[in-house]
Each structure stands twice: as structure tokens, then as C-alpha cells.
């Protein structure tokens, strides 16, 4: 196993590395959205190289990160992150609404997202929701609940990731495929451990039974993320 403790650079952001690896063979370390949020993991590259990732706690890997480079063989180990697409809901137009309308719309939107068990992060007057179903289904939910007046679009997860703090990225992309977790709407403040609104919706237990939580509450997590299971 090869221990990786530092990132050498990024082939997608650094012109120096772009030129250096222009004719190199890239051995990809392919990570899914959950793995990408971990600073420590063990995984093999596409060429079978066994890597042990051990980065500083607040460092997470980014798409295009260069982990190793062998000039003699002209081979570089580069990170490839596969993130889900994201629905982006623009809330800017609510600024022109009355306070009552704004509160009502935000509450109803949160309720709708909660009922679908969709994770979400609010930032820069936008709501980011990772896709867990077809875009047609998400489009239908928005229109069925009367949110067609709110502009929304679908973009690649990689376009959203640079705008997020590490904690927000973990919240949005870490385990977005889980169907039995609560929906979390993060604080718009770019803080590593901000509190968030937790919207409790219907939970399936895998045995055919389900139940509904009709209460909302907010609480902080301290310095860790966790799922709620019943």
C-alpha cells in the first residue's frame, strides 16, 4: 500500500500540472460522492495501485487532484470524483415578496423537500438538492406543490462543489443515496459547524411500515455528521 498524505496539485486548476501531464498516462482514483468527503480511506486505482489516503482532517479530495507522479514512467495518479447532478432552486425573487409570503413559501418548500427525503443546502439565495430520482420526478414535485414561480435548473455536482464549505459538501453529497435519512437544510453561513434546520418526514423501515414526524426542530451536531435512524 502506498500512503498518500499530501496533494501535489490539481490538473484541472493548475496550468503547471496541466502542461506537465499533457502527455502522461493517468491512473485514476475514482471516488463516489460519499468517499470524496473522507480525508481518510483506502482504495485501489484503475491500474490496481493500492492507496491509503491520510490527509489532514479538514482536507478533502477534489476532482483532478494529483496524488502521485512518476516522471520516469510518465504516470500520474489523479482523482476522479463522480458526483450526482444537483437541482438548483433560485430564491432571489422572494426578496420582493412580503415577509408573510416569504416565510410561507420557505416553510412550504422545506416541507415539500422533507416529504421526499431530499437533502438540501441553502446558500447564496439558492437551494441545492442532489438528484436521487429522475429530473422529471423532481420537476413534477416542484410544480405539483406550486413552486413553478421559483426558477430552478439542473447542473453537474462538480459545478456546485467549489461553492461549498467542506461541511456543506459532506451534507449535500455524503450519502445522498440514503433513503432513510432526514432532510437537512444547512445554515447559509459558511461555517464549518453551523446549525441546521432538520425537517423530519416519512420514514420507511424496510419492513413495510412507515411513520410520519409532524414536528420540526433545530439542533447542532457539534463536529460530526450523523444519520438518524428509527
From Swiss-Prot:
It comes from Yersinia aldovae. It comes from the Bacteria. GO terms for biological process: protein folding. One of its GO terms (cellular component) is cytoplasm. Belongs to the UreE family. This is Urease accessory protein UreE. Residues 204-230 have a biased composition (Basic and acidic residues). It is found in: Cytoplasm. Signal peptide: none annotated. Keywords: Chaperone, Cytoplasm, Nickel, Nickel insertion.
